[in-house]
Amino acid sequence: FREDATFVKKFRSEAQAAAGLTHPNIVNVFDVGDDEGVYYIVMELIEGITLKEYISKKGKLSVKEATSIAIQVSMGLEAAHSHGIVHRDVKPQNIIISTDGKVKVTDFGIARAASSNTISSNVMGSVHYSSPEQVRGGYSDEKSDIYSLGITLYEMVTGRVPFDGDTTVAIAIKHLQEEMVPPSVYTENLPYSLEQIILKCTQKSVGRRYEKMEDVIADLKHSLIDPQGNFVTLSSVDNEAKTVVISDEELGEIKNTPRASS
């Protein structure tokens, strides 16, 4: 990417913005610069493993542990959103669990820089966690992060991603058109409230998701004290959520994204 002037400019701008973020659930960025044409970013050193590695090790997480991790991730993202920064690449690989149990979100500047007009929004990430609007190459905002958080939470409680396939295109189309198998199908006794939170986060229609990350946090905390409660509000299915038609141009955009990797 260093040969791409637009990317370099975007990377420096967004990484510097990320450097202004200080939060217990974010890997802090201390410095951004270049040394004789080599661009670098100095980040907080965290001893630990990624959430992806942790899930692979345990198979699936307990409800309490998954909810606790989701709350911490949400708090980090909420702090970023309050500063006008959208991550756009939320996935277990970009979430670190430190040796003392603290959960931190990383790669803010890189993720945002990769969403410049000259680079596909999926270049830096995995389509397994991308929102429908991202795989279509459209506008993405805080609600895109909410969708990706929902997919991540789904994987934590089931040990699998909801949409998979042999190619990026196949997975992208599933995000756009295929109904998600409820996580309770794979995890017995999954609390009703937590399943509803996951389903609300991962609605294909942006308007049917949570409005803000703080609303996600509130419901996640509520689910810990009222696991079977019916307090998550899901709006009725609209036409946008029922049918998504992919144009030839959009299909071409999807095909130009890198091969899928989970």
Protein language model regions, located:
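Activation-segment/catalytic-loop signature of the eukaryotic protein kinase fold
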Residues: 32
